[in-house]
Amino acid sequence: MSEEQLKAFIAKVQGDSSLQEQLKAEGADVVAIAKAAGFTIKQQDLNAAASELSDEELEAASGGGDTGIQAVLHTAGCYGGTKMCRA
């Protein structure tokens, strides 16, 4: 199930500074990054995760851009326009 894959990917991102750095890159392709890390997720899963965030959480996650990316960054502990990730 793709939702389980997304949750597993998020857990991996939280403990992997290399993945965090990849996700911080401008225009990061979350689906491709997840695939390279051995996870199978879809853009729809990212969009669904983003829809579960409040407006305030989405705003805190990033000042714009793709909400699927915002959801992953927010959930993985990455905030702000600079998308800084906590280790």
Swiss-Prot record:
One GO location term (cellular component): extracellular region
UniProt xrefs under Pfam families: Nif11
Maturation propeptide residues: 1-64
Protein's cellular compartments: Secreted
Regulation: induction: Down-regulated under nitrogen starvation.
Covalent cross-link site, Beta-methyllanthionine (Thr-Cys): 75-85
Residue location of crosslink Beta-methyllanthionine (Cys-Thr): 78-82
Post-translational modification comment from the UniProt entry: Cross-links are proved in vitro, when coepressed in E.coli with the ProcM lanthionine synthetase. The beta-methyllanthionine residues have a DL configuration (with 2S,3S,6R stereochemistry).
Entry keyword set: Secreted, Thioether bond
2,3-didehydrobutyrine, modified sites: 67
UniProt cross-references to InterPro entries, sorted A to Z: CHP03798_Ocin, Nif11
Described purpose of this protein according to its UniProt entry: Lanthionine-containing peptide (lantipeptide) with unknown function. Does not show antibiotic activity against Lactococcus lactis 117 and Bacillus subtilis 6633 bacteria. Organisms that produce this peptide live in oligotrophic environments at very dilute concentrations, suggesting this peptide is not secreted to influence other bacteria.
Protein name, per record: Lantipeptide prochlorosin 3.3
Organism the protein comes from: Prochlorococcus marinus (strain MIT 9313)
